[in-house]
Amino acid sequence: MGNLTVSQANNIWSPNGNSLAVFVDGVSGILKLKDALGNVQPFEDYVTVMYGTGGIYSQTANSTPITATTSELTLIDGGVGTLNVPANGFSVGDSYIANLSGIMSAKNNNSLIIRIKSGNVVLAQSQPLVMPAINNQVWNLQVNFTIRTIGGANIASIVTAGEMHVLKLASGTQEGFGFSAINNTTFNTTILNTLNITAQWSSTDVQNSIYTNLFVLTKIY
């Protein structure tokens, strides 16, 4: 893990013998922080939380197209910032907004499901959106979520709401749907949480394709 280069003057003792420390990883060269429970995270993950509101993540490349498959796959690609909130990094009232846009094609009457996740935990998901026949059309998705309570599973609570719109170029109209959910059973703020947004088609038809060319995550409270 590398040598300890900087540490708190009065290290915090914990029952398992760990202490709060900041160090440079000898392999990756990344500045990291070890908390009093022994959890190790990149230091920037903690800094993002401590600095409060503002930009958290900005995608800098198109995501891999989800095409001709019924597998649930991510709409997110690489970027700058972080999608991680470290263990015990949330506070009650923390609120975020995610804005995504991209290009989509679909076969008439095939459907699409959008899921908002933290790791493998589903925070919210849409009902199947039955698509019109479209080709290379613009879509937009906005997701808001707020931490209601913190703690372990069955104690922590998060509310998530999303709204997606797809432009039908031929008619100039939009198709869309909204969804909202509260997760107060499997959401856990005492562990690392990593945001993911996924899409899943109902069929493997080659006309079905979606990718993201813009994604920005912002902490608003």
Each model region followed by its residue ranges:
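Short, surface-exposed terminal/edge motifs of secreted or surface/virion proteins that either
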Residues: M1, V24-Y46
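Generic hydrophobic/packing signal
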Residues: L20, K34-A36, L100
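Surface-exposed molecular-recognition determinants
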Residues: Y46-Y221
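Generic short beta-strand
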Residues: A21, L31, I113-I114
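Intrinsically disordered, low-complexity peptide-like regions
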Residues: Q8-A9, S14, F23, L33, ...
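Predominantly extracellular/luminal cell-surface or secreted proteins
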Residues: S7, K34, R115-G119
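Extracellular/surface-exposed low-complexity repeats and stalk/linker segments enriched in Gly/Pro
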Residues: M1-V22, S28
